[in-house]
A protein has these predicted regions:
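Compositionally biased terminal segments of proteins
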Residues: 1-273
Length: 273
């Protein structure tokens, strides 16, 4: 597990504060069962108005539990804070994010509410196309190695802001792969020892080339659609044949929480946050 002990303790402390509109996301959740370590905890909210109140409630809970907290950034729709236990520290970021997603949120006793792994993977495609960060490229390699091919994610990403075409998404990711210096890849924490800058770059370029071939051959009606199997894992359609594939479209509408077998899911109710 990529979380530090401090991050795990913080998440357990704050699990009771998570809800349908305040949930865990970002690189920490994507990599929670993989190798890469993240320096921050991302907590997403559906609206800017919710952010400050959620941050205050979380910080109050952490203070009561004996953690040391300090607000570093306080602006409308965004709060950053450093949290420590005397031996180590991490950053928590609260901010607003579009609630348009392909799956309902998932909730369990340990983590609170979080984005479904498929949505985390689609969001990583969006991040890798929108900014030049070595950790995003490393995460693409990890997604392909541990979870699913990138092609279906690229097609699905067209259904979320900024609604780039799949081809533009591919082009932007490729540009970022080639433009990131080797030392930035080397600075990414927790990666396997054989994940050198050269390895990550070569793997990412191969994966993007494969994804490009897939999107160029995919039926036009899959634009903005996520194709998944019965286990809700994104899949490629072979020769355009849909078979038992499930097609999901991103939506803003609230949905009932699912109960994936890997989670001990609890019901929402008046006694739960």
């Amino acid at each position: 597990m990529a979380l530090t002990q401090l991050q795990s303790d913080i998440l357990r402390c704050l699990a009771k504060n998570r809800s349908e509109t305040s949930y865990l996301a970002g690189g920490l959740m994507l990599n929670k069962n993989w190798k890469r370590r993240s320096d921050d905890i991302d907590i997403f909210h559906d609206t800017d108005e919710e952010v400050t109140g959620a941050a205050d409630a979380d910080l109050a809970a952490l203070d009561a539990a004996g953690f040391k907290t300090h607000k570093d950034v306080i602006i409308y729709g965004c709060v950053d804070a450093t949290v420590s236990n005397g031996n180590s520290s991490t950053i928590i970021q609260w901010f607003a994010e579009t609630k348009r997603r392909f799956f309902p949120l998932v909730r369990d006793e340990e983590w609170g509410a979080r984005l479904h792994l498929a949505d985390l993977a689609v969001n990583k495609i969006l991040a890798a196309s929108g900014r030049s960060k070595a950790r995003d490229i490393a995460d693409l390699v990890a997604i392909a190695q541990h979870y699913c091919p990138l092609g279906p994610l690229v097609l699905a990403a067209a259904g979320k802001p900024p609604n780039f075409s799949p081809k533009r998404t591919i082009d932007e990711i490729r540009r970022h792969i080639l433009g990131i210096p080797a030392e930035e890849f080397a600075a990414v924490k927790g990666l396997p020892v054989d994940w050198t800058a050269e390895f990550i770059r070569e793997q990412a370029l191969q994966l993007i080339e494969q994804a490009e071939k897939y999107i160029m051959a995919a039926p036009a009606d899959l634009l903005g659609i996520l194709t998944v199997d019965k286990q809700s894992i994104p899949i490629e359609l072979v020769d355009g044949k849909r078979g038992n594939a499930i097609l999901r479209k991103a939506t803003d509408e609230p949905e009932v929480m699912p109960s994936p077998p890997e989670f001990n899911v609890v019901e929402w109710g008046s006694t739960r946050p």
